[in-house]
Amino acid sequence: MLSVMVSSSLVLIVFFLGASEEAKPATTTTIKNTKPQCRPEDYATRLQDLRVTFHRVKPTLQREDDYSVWLDGTVVKGCWGCSVMDWLLRRYLEIVFPAGDHVYPGLKTELHSMRSTLESIYKDMRQCPLLGCGDKSVISRLSQEAERKSDNGTRKGLSELDTLFSRLEEYLHSRK
């Protein structure tokens, strides 16, 4: 199970940071820089908002979680950290949160709020050249493993949101 988590994390990080900045032609007009900041502290407020929202629904989400921790501290360390983080965030945004609406219909407002905030962080991270990475070869295998878990994977994923937020924060700080 741990190797699946580490592999999943590795894939996420590789994919997550795959964005690169396109070359822009030189112009004589000064254009205001609208790119997001790339410093970890630029994400602190949004991460705190995620934690506050999760804290309100944590008992409900963790009530049915009888699995061991998937997102251990090694997932964002090392050369695969960017791929793992990318895969994890995409997985949460594309699969876990949408499935959570069906598994926990009474928590739709909170889940939508957390998803929206996480989408904002993810979008900014993808646009930050300092957070880019390349190799995406492991992503497919990890995605297939996660898909086999179905609703149990959704429950597990939502119950570990606080751990995801911690790993995201660790990752952002490691890229200074």
Curated annotation (Swiss-Prot):
Q: Where would one find the signal peptide in this protein? A: 1-25
Where is this chain glycosylated?
152
UniProt main location, coarse: secreted
- Cystine bridges: which residues? 38-128, 82-133
Instruction: Please list the GO terms describing molecular function.
Output: cytokine activity
Q: A single GO CC term, please?
A: extracellular space
SMART domains attached here? IL10
Record keywords: Signal included? yes
Q: Reply yes or no: does the keyword Isomerase apply.
A: no
Compartments in which it is found: Secreted
Q: Please give the function described in this protein's UniProt entry.
A: Functional viral IL-10 homolog. Can bind to the human IL-10 receptor and compete with human IL-10 for binding sites. Requires both subunits of the human IL-10 receptor complex to induce signal transduction events and biological activities. IL-10 signaling pathway has several immunosuppressive activities that are exploited by the virus. Inhibits TLR-induced type I interferon production in host plasmacytoid dendritic cells.
Name the record gives this protein: Viral interleukin-10 homolog
The organism of origin for this protein: Human cytomegalovirus (strain Merlin) (HHV-5)
